[in-house]
A protein has these predicted regions:
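A conserved mid-protein helix/loop that constitutes part of the nucleotide-sugar donor-binding site
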Residues: 16-21, 201, 205, 210-224, ...
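Glycosyltransferase donor-sugar binding loop
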Residues: 35-42, 206, 233-248
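Short His-centered aromatic/hydrophobic patch
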Residues: 91-97, 116
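Short hydrophobic beta-strand element within catalytic cores of glycosyltransferases
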Residues: 303-306, 316
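Conserved acidic donor-binding segment of nucleotide-sugar-dependent glycosyltransferases
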Residues: 318-319, 323-330, 339-344
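A short, well-ordered alpha-helix in the C-terminal region of glycosyltransferases
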Residues: 332, 339, 346-361, 367-373
Length: 377
């Protein structure tokens, strides 16, 4: 008889971008897979079904801070799980790990695994002091983790810093835990292309245009570099999240476009075409799980510039496939950009090294085998 597994994430977009390969591999291994998420459309339901899985809706909204609504959703998800009757539940990201794990326990699910893919904004450092709201959210998050994590049979982390900070620093008991080192990348989809150094060096930032992603450091460094090397290209791909308080403004973005510091095509679906055009992938983030975008850029043979913070530092061997710079440091980021411009002959080998690290460390097939074996323990 086929085993049933329910994968619970926050939003459908998360499933599409981060769980596709795992769902497909589970289906290949003859699991009956149910994908539980918020925000389905008829089109996204069809996509999930095309993978061989069954879409199921929940209403546990990622940004909702209403504890009463979250409590109601715990019991609604429990009801759905009782109907599905899965052998295994995998919860992913902050809210599902906290609330849906409790739902699974109340539903009597035999094996429950939680995957914490970064600790989130509450645990992310900031160049300026955080306000009362951020501190309160962190306090509540830790309190809720202390309730939910002991209900899990195993907790998975992407990097060792997240594990030590959450479990050891805050003294949270778990039955079992493991660091899996990233969710991986499909090496066939993200193919290697040798660096083109016949033209001017180009840099790319890919992600939401938020303070904690390092967008302001990227922009400031780009302006500094353009003062010395005006022909350098800086691409930015990503949307402004207008509902996020740390998002950059449209006015600021437009200033950099008007000043010809950056090239901004906005949100695009052909991301790989822009990565191919670029030499260096830049993510000056303040904290990550292990960024999938960086793994994809590595697979495509890009040099990586990133920060010395949890999650980001897992993607670079300093000087081998890129450079690690101090977090918040526009000056050092610009210096490394200039170094790569002035020593662009090094880009070919560094890009090749990125691909090799991706093959050895971030092959999604190997990582999924590990995850599936953990789920089936």
């Amino acid at each position: 008889m086929r085993k049933r597994i329910a994968i619970i994430v926050n939003e459908v977009s998360t499933l599409l971008h981060f769980r596709k390969e795992l769902v497909k591999d589970l289906v290949k291994e003859q699991y009956e897979v149910f994908c539980i998420a918020e925000g389905y459309s008829s089109q996204t339901k069809d996509i999930i079904r095309s993978w061989g899985a069954e879409p199921v809706e929940h209403n546990l909204k990622r940004s909702n801070l209403n504890p009463l609504n979250d409590l109601v959703q715990v019991f609604k998800i429990r009801k759905k799980l009782k109907q599905i009757s899965p052998d295994i539940v995998l919860t992913c990201f902050v809210k599902p790990v906290i609330f849906a794990s409790i739902s699974a326990k109340l539903a009597g699910v035999k094996r429950i695994v939680g995957m914490i893919e970064g600790l989130g904004y509450a645990f992310t450092p900031s160049p300026t002091p955080k306000g009362f709201k951020s501190k309160l959210i962190k306090f509540l998050q830790i309190f809720l983790y202390k309730i939910s994590l002991p209900t899990l049979d195993k907790v998975l982390f992407l990097n060792p810093d997240d594990k030590s900070e959450l479990l050891e620093k805050h003294n949270i008991y778990v039955k079992d835990s493991e660091v899996i080192g990233g969710i991986g990348v499909n090496l066939d989809d993200y193919f290697y292309t040798e660096q083109n150094i016949s033209d001017n060096v180009s840099f790319i930032f890919l992600g939401r245009l938020l303070k904690e992603k390092g967008i302001f450091e990227f922009l400031s460094a780009a302006r500094k570099v353009k003062e010395k090397y005006s022909q350098t290209k800086f691409f930015i791909l990503g949307q402004i999240d207008k509902q996020n308080p740390t998002a950059m403004s449209e006015e600021m973005l437009q200033t950099y476009i008007d000043d010809e510091i950056i090239i901004y095509p906005g949100y695009v679906t052909n991301v790989q075409e822009y990565i191919v055009k670029s030499n260096v992938f830049v993510l000056p983030s303040y904290r990550e799980g292990v960024p999938k975008s960086t793994q994809e850029a590595m697979a495509m043979g890009k040099v990586i510039l990133t920060t010395d913070v949890p999650g980001c530092k897992e993607t670079v061997v300093d000087g081998l496939n890129g450079f690690i710079v101090p977090v918040f440091s526009t000056h050092e980021l610009a210096e490394k950009m200039i170094y790569l411009i002035e020593n662009k002959s090094e880009l070919v080998q560094m890009g090749y090294n990125s691909r090799k690290i991706a093959e050895n460390k971030f092959n999604v097939r190997n990582i999924n085998k590990k995850i599936i074996s953990i789920l089936d323990e």
